[in-house]
């Protein structure tokens, strides 16, 4: 078990502290009802946990300590290194690994994984008991998952097309939510606010209107929308 509190994620935060901050943002979104699907939430928590593990390599730590720039000759982007710490036996590994791998766009990630294996192994050598090999077969699966699904490829197997499409759509959600949580944690801002303020403000506004015009009230459409605040509504004029 790696003690992430020993490694810096940035000047003022350890990897453990930042990861906990990101996880807390995910929990906030879930608790406030912005994440409805339990499955998406569980995958997001895993992605939040692992997304910055790659920063514990010695070159990154040296760069943070010495405040130097990224060295393309001796470093690999941390998002690439991070996925080697994810156990491929966990549920929904491919979606979680893909979300972590592409949560930054610092390089051609798949090319790096295929063509810079020696440097990757060197940077992860100190953590040999905590990492998992990723072969070309898995790299190919990740490449297929991140790209748009070609329906023509599955015209003889619509069920497989349905499965692949669902998996890709779940990846889009998890990756997007990971971005939100990571950016919010890095900026040290609230990720979202409770959606409980608008009704009171509208009621107060109506009371002010009724002081001048006692018969004022909401029209039929407005009443409908107020009664369906938890639903997705499309209104056409």
Predicted regions, residues:
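Dynamic helix-loop-helix/coil hinge segments at AAA+ ATPase domain boundaries and subdomain interfaces
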Residues: 13-15, 207-216
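Residues that form generic nucleotide/phosphate-binding pockets
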Residues: 85, 205-208, 224, 228
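Accessory nucleic-acid engagement/destabilization modules that flank
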Residues: 2-11, 15-205
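Pre-Walker A adenine-sensing motif
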Residues: 216-230
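Walker A/P-loop
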Residues: 229-237
């Amino acid at each position: 078990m790696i003690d992430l509190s020993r490694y810096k994620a940035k000047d003022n935060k350890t990897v453990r502290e930042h990861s906990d901050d990101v996880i807390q943002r995910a929990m906030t979104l879930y608790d406030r009802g912005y994440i409805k699907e339990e499955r998406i939430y569980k995958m997001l928590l895993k992605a939040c946990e692992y997304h910055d593990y790659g920063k514990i390599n010695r070159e990154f730590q040296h760069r943070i300590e010495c405040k130097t720039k990224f060295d393309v000759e001796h470093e690999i982007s941390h998002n690439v290194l991070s996925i080697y710490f994810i156990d491929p036996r966990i549920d929904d590994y491919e979606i979680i690994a893909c979300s972590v791998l592409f949560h930054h766009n610092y390089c051609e990630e798949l090319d790096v994984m295929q063509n810079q294996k020696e440097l990757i192994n060197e940077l992860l050598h100190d953590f040999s008991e905590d990492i998992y090999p990723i072969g070309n077969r898995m790299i190919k699966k990740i490449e297929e998952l991140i790209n748009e699904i070609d329906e023509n490829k599955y015209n003889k197997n619509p069920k497989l097309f349905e499965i692949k499409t669902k998996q890709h759509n779940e990846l889009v959600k998890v990756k997007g939510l990971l971005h939100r949580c990571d950016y919010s944690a890095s900026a040290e801002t609230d990720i979202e606010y409770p959606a409980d303020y608008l009704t009171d403000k509208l009621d107060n506004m109506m009371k002010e209107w009724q002081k001048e015009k006692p018969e004022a009230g909401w029209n039929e459409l407005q009443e409908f929308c107020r009664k369906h605040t938890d639903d997705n509504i499309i209104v056409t004029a």
